[in-house]
């Protein structure tokens, strides 16, 4: 009887290891996808969007006349079917976000691994961009990263709408270095969100001295249609030997058909008002073999190789 039990246990161990290896191989061959909850500007919306399936969120950041980040506010107009006026004081939002992304906190949401800050720098003069970056860094360091002491763990993307505001990136980096935490730049990525020519975007990054940690967005409000020609150009840059883009995301996607089109185009992220729609498509037979929802173990700055 004993040899039989040993044999059974041995076979079960082999099968379990094979199944685990198979799962790991399937995970490794599937593109990780960031489902980005759009316009998450109130603390209560963090749980709302994550519970619907988002593993990342996008938050608007408005600035005052002195280039201080002031509110998490979008304003009118915004996407069709959304409340455009929800907001928090920026630092209050950061504290709520820190709670949601700090392991051990009662508010912790393990699935929330990336935050895109949509920086509304259109209200600023070009010569204020560097200062805005410095002030943004100071706020994040204190209220999100808790001065480097067990702060929030999510990766951060600084999304800038104007190529002329590239000095914001340098100001942000310089301030973190000055405050003794240059290592936090490992958690920070970049995006220019103005739908500019891909070549012009590359020139802006050269001026900013940035290589790596680059997401490229493309999109338009859900109220209007938009083709995928620029997405295709961004994906081609990402996949080329000399491209500068690491990841591509498309916004704002609320329909299953558009989700399928975006996935077929090879995007890494989809920004949406309805994360459950994206999740449903990812679970379809045609897509679950090719894609999976990204986790914290997926580095958002590393280009996924097909």
UniProtKB/Swiss-Prot annotation:
Q: What domain of life does the native source organism fall in?
A: Eukaryota
Entry's Gene3D superfamilies? Phosphatidylinositol (PI) phosphodiesterase (3.20.20.190)
Q: Name one GO cellular component term.
A: extracellular region
Q: Kindly give the Pfam families that the UniProt entry links to this protein.
A: GDPD_2 (PF13653)
Q: What cofactor is this protein dependent on?
A: Mg(2+)
Q: Which residues form the signal peptide?
A: 1-18
Q: Which Enzyme Commission number(s) are listed?
A: 4.6.1.-
Propeptide part(s) removed at maturation, as residue ranges? 19-26
Paste the cofactor note. Binds 1 Mg(2+) ion per subunit.
Keywords per UniProt: Cytolysis, Dermonecrotic toxin, Disulfide bond, Hemolysis, Lipid degradation, Lipid metabolism, Lyase, Magnesium, Metal-binding, Secreted, Signal, Toxin, Zymogen
> What is the reaction catalyzed?
an N-(acyl)-sphingosylphosphocholine = an N-(acyl)-sphingosyl-1,3-cyclic phosphate + choline; an N-(acyl)-sphingosylphosphoethanolamine = an N-(acyl)-sphingosyl-1,3-cyclic phosphate + ethanolamine; a 1-acyl-sn-glycero-3-phosphocholine = a 1-acyl-sn-glycero-2,3-cyclic phosphate + choline; a 1-acyl-sn-glycero-3-phosphoethanolamine = a 1-acyl-sn-glycero-2,3-cyclic phosphate + ethanolamine
Whether Signal counts among this entry's keywords is: yes
Active-site residues (renumbered) = 38, 74
Which residues participate in Mg(2+) binding?
58, 60, 118
Which biological process terms from the Gene Ontology are attached to this UniProt entry? killing of cells of another organism; lipid catabolic process
> Where's it mainly located?
secreted
Q: Which cysteines are joined by disulfide bonds?
A: 78-84, 80-223
Q: What would be an example GO MF term here?
A: toxin activity
Which tissues show it?
A: Expressed by the venom gland.
CDD domains noted in UniProt: GDPD_like_SMaseD_PLD
Q: Where in the cell is it found?
A: Secreted
Q: Which residues form a coiled coil?
A: none
Which family does the record assign? Belongs to the arthropod phospholipase D family. Class II subfamily. Class IIa sub-subfamily.
The entry's function note states: Dermonecrotic toxins cleave the phosphodiester linkage between the phosphate and headgroup of certain phospholipids (sphingolipid and lysolipid substrates), forming an alcohol (often choline) and a cyclic phosphate. This toxin acts on sphingomyelin (SM). The level of enzymatic activity is high according to Tambourgi and colleagues or low according to Felicori and colleagues. It may also act on ceramide phosphoethanolamine (CPE), lysophosphatidylcholine (LPC) and lysophosphatidylethanolamine (LPE), but not on lysophosphatidylserine (LPS), and lysophosphatidylglycerol (LPG).
**What is this protein's name?**
Dermonecrotic toxin LiSicTox-alphaIA1bi
Q: Which organism is it from?
A: Loxosceles intermedia
Lineage of producing organism = Eukaryota, Metazoa, Ecdysozoa, Arthropoda, Chelicerata
